[in-house]
A protein has these predicted regions:
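Internal interaction segment
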Residues: 81-141
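Bacterial N-terminal signal peptides that target proteins for export
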Residues: 1-8
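N-terminal signal peptide c-region/cleavage motif recognized by signal peptidases
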Residues: 9, 17-19
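An ectodomain-focused feature that recognizes extracytoplasmic/extracellular
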Residues: 22-72
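Short beta-strand/loop motifs in extracellular/secreted proteins, especially
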Residues: 73-78, 117
Length: 141
């Protein structure tokens, strides 16, 4: 007769009791001919609008739209990747327009979303944290 090791039994029970956290899923769509990517949580939401083909003219028309439950009118949002990379985005009325954001910061934000993993959007009074799968085909620059 084979007796299960107590250490193995405890390890198996511990592994079964550890909850598996599902990744936050981007909702992908198209609005006015532009690709959109949205994430929502109980604490707020974020929507990225891309214009890789310059549909509405030669200037960039991308935007990051944010809504925080505890900070209704932030003037700055920082996108923080788990790696420590950060992008600072000036916000007006919940919108960070690509044309108004430093190109390097916009690129860092897009790279963070493209890479997936854990990241946060932070204001002076609130934050949203997500963990997503990579978006390797994200074209938003």
């Amino acid at each position: 007769m084979h007796v299960l090791s107590p250490v193995l039994a405890v390890s198996a029970l511990a592994a079964m009791s550890v909850p598996v956290q599902a990744l936050d899923a981007w909702t992908v769509g198209v609005e006015r001919g532009l690709p959109t990517y949205a994430l929502a949580s109980e604490a707020g939401e974020v929507r990225l609008v891309c214009d890789p083909d310059r549909v509405f003219g030669p200037s960039p028309n991308g935007a990051l739209v944010v809504a925080f439950d505890k900070d209704a009118a932030p003037d700055m949002v920082v996108v923080l990747a788990k790696s420590g990379e950060q992008a600072r985005l000036p916000v007006k009325n919940g919108l960070a327009a690509q044309a108004s954001v430093e190109a390097a910061d916009w690129s860092k934000m897009v790279a963070t979303f493209r890479a997936g993993g854990e990241f946060a959007l932070v204001t002076s009074a609130d934050s949203l944290t997500f963990e997503t799968a990579p978006l390797p085909d994200l074209a938003c620059e």
